[in-house]
Amino acid sequence: MRVFTMLLGLLISSFSAIGADMSDGADNFYKSDKVTQQKVTFKNQYQMNVTGNLFTPKDMNRSVKNPAIVIGHPMGAVKEQSSNLYAQKLAEQGFVTLAIDLSFWGESEGKPGHLISPEIYSDDFSAAVDYLSTQLYVDPEKIGVLGICGSGSFAVSAAKIDPRMKAIATVSMYDMGSVFRNGLNHSVTPEQRKAFIKSATEQRLVEFKGGDIAYIPGTVNKLDDSTSAVQREFFDFYRTSRGGYTPQGEKEELTTKPMLSSIGKFMNFYPFNDIETISPRPMLFITGDQAHSKEFSEDAYKRAGQPKELYIVPGAGHVDLYDRTDLIPFAKLTSFFKENLK
């Protein structure tokens, strides 16, 4: 486990930075008085229940077909962290929005909890499109997707094989496959990767024999002098009143922490392969100019087909775009979806 912990310091992914920094309009738990919220549940193709919060404008005309957007949360988070904020802000602009909990997280089904399964995560986006397509007030030809952090890569993966997703946007995207294989800025060596995989397979056998589940560190539970700048960034969101949230029935100290034994599934996850086949459906990649994750949006943009846009937010880091309403380019997202879901 020591080898694994050392490697996690190199990987530093976004499932997860002493008081919460509430600057630049940080408002994760925003509540709009202009929209209605309804909890909904629907099946994915694996017959697992996916739970989401459905937001509709209070002044929406339900006798006509309206555009809709599926929104996915950061990896290791739940819909109450970042996704609900984006969903409400976009619903205020006239969209039907659906913020989902990915399978194995939050209120969605999946045992054991916190298991990594990018294939199922991606199917959750398609299942959300299934659900929205059956609502009488939603136009099934005008459904877009928005993935935040790790969900950006799941949304891209889903869109490659689901042409019903007419417009695809990502914010502070992580390529969850690349960051596990290579670390940030390709800082992980092949030998370190092999040691990482070995730790996971050894733990898998422990669990098969009835042993306790082990989790990868995710966001640290407390800071010390050795805590990295990236982890401090996540700590300020996930471990403070700014964005901390513990789903019912879970332990606070385990939030953001995926199962160690399942990390091999990210090693085999290549969401940007064939990304160009999404064209001619439009793609928008939003990242901050200070974001440690910027490399992933730049890579996706380079490999995607037209039409595409890389939108860089000045002065914004990775986690800033989770909840800092003075930095999040809601106007850009609104114009992108209005133009491409009309």
PLM ranges: what are they?
Residues 278-279, 284-287:
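Short beta-strand/loop motif that positions the catalytic acidic residue
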Residues 156-240:
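Alpha/beta-hydrolase-fold enzymes
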Residues 316-319, 323-342:
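Catalytic active-site module of serine/aspartate enzymes centered on a nucleophile-bearing elbow/loop
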Residues 89-109:
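Conserved alpha/beta-hydrolase
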Residues 79, 105-141, 323, 327-329:
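Catalytic nucleophile-loop/oxyanion-hole region of alpha/beta-hydrolase
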Residues 21-64, 322:
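N-terminal cap/lid segment of alpha/beta-hydrolase-fold proteins
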